């Protein structure tokens, strides 16, 4: 039996995600972000609900990325997620992209020239943003040109780096329908951004969310729910530069701006510069919200849910892979659990996110 892996956020799970699962072969393992997303925002619905959505539409096993993998730049996000899939025995990584290239060949380039490529990035000017450095590297070594308007392609290149040396094969699938940043909807597909913006429109939800009833019943949150807490964290923290990835310049810019803004969006606009992209600023604000500090990643894999086939596979691998299926007194990952506690503060109706929760099972 072949084993396919997918790296996902499912924020929320829509028809494009269902299509990608349908293209994957064999046992389908999804490593999914928890309650905070790669670009620095809370998930619209919680991780358990999103895991159930995936399991209802073809996933066999859904496991969780730790917070410090989930909320990271593309390369770190990809590397951490692929490490989890590799431990679980995944043979092929299936992913959507706007650009259908020979990503396996690109991965081979990185295998051959990784040290040279990383040194090239280190020697680029400090005023280059991380995406600019990445784009310059791929243009220099692979002749690729692209912009920030193709985030799935950027992630695909990060996956090409991440699988180097693992033996995992890359299996790209042409992205269907609306672009990642698009707020437009098409006949069969809409972007997650469009769905989040139209979350209160029942026709939109029912047309583009395969698990529409689950989504309708779930407690929904956005940055708006957390802004008062974020403002409190910023104004009372004794030294913001002690928070993960917050340097003195960012700390100063954030403190200077917080008194004159009323939303997270306004704060992001005020802090963003050519060097500090909006995505980086949102991630930094997420770290401040959680009061994140750098901690080692957990060795064990946290299981969010499985099908009968997925459960049978877990029994096969449990002797060689540390698995966590219920968090009690012993923590799995203290920072992820801290993030879950903060996430729960977003709404009174929010369900417990960590303690005593057991994997979702879908037959």
Swiss-Prot record:
Keywords: ATP-binding, Cytoplasm, Ligase, Nucleotide-binding, RNA-binding, tRNA processing, tRNA-binding. InterPro entries: Rossmann-like_a/b/a_fold, tRNA(Met)_cyd_acetate_ligase. One of its GO terms (biological process) is tRNA modification. It comes from the Bacteria. GO terms for cellular component: cytoplasm. Its EC number is 6.3.4.-. It is found in: Cytoplasm. GO terms for molecular function: ATP binding; ligase activity, forming carbon-nitrogen bonds; tRNA binding. ATP binds at residues 7-20, 96, 152, 175. Coiled coil: none annotated. HAMAP family: TmcAL. Belongs to the TmcAL family. Catalyzes the formation of N(4)-acetylcytidine (ac(4)C) at the wobble position of elongator tRNA(Met), using acetate and ATP as substrates. First activates an acetate ion to form acetyladenylate (Ac-AMP) and then transfers the acetyl group to tRNA to form ac(4)C34. This is tRNA(Met) cytidine acetate ligase. It comes from Streptococcus suis (strain 98HAH33). The lineage of its organism: Bacteria, Bacillati, Bacillota, Bacilli, Lactobacillales.
